[in-house]
Amino acid sequence: MKEKRGRLTFPINGEALHVPDSTYLACPRGHEPVLRLDDARRLREHAIDLYRSKYRLLSSEEIRSIRQRFGLTQGELARLLRLGQNTLSRWEAGRNVQTAAMDVLLRLLRDVPGGLEYLRKHAA
């Protein structure tokens, strides 16, 4: 197997995203790329970043910043948004992408005064 770099396709939410400059192994007999675990992880994270950029979703850093701005733990924000803590953790780590609806809710929390208090009152 020989290491190569090139454009690979990765599906995010049913959409095939073309990720440039990806590292993979090429088998001389086969046509399918072979990915090492670290390369596959980087490919997925890069595809998620491309998806977020394409649809103008908050980045993982922006999501973390919103949570930290209010002094919340991942568990506290997850409860307010009615999510599992692991889901929020994956968004912040760039391993999964939030839905458009959750993106809007996070933006409202960030941009609308009193949003946190409203969620605290009505999330239970």
Question: Over which residues does each language-model region extend?
Answer:
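N-terminal flexible/basic segments that precede or flank functional cores
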Residues: 1-57, 111-124
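Extended interfacial segments that mediate partner engagement and assembly in macromolecular machines
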Residues: 35-101
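Short, Lys/Arg-rich amphipathic alpha-helical interaction segments
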Residues: 90-124
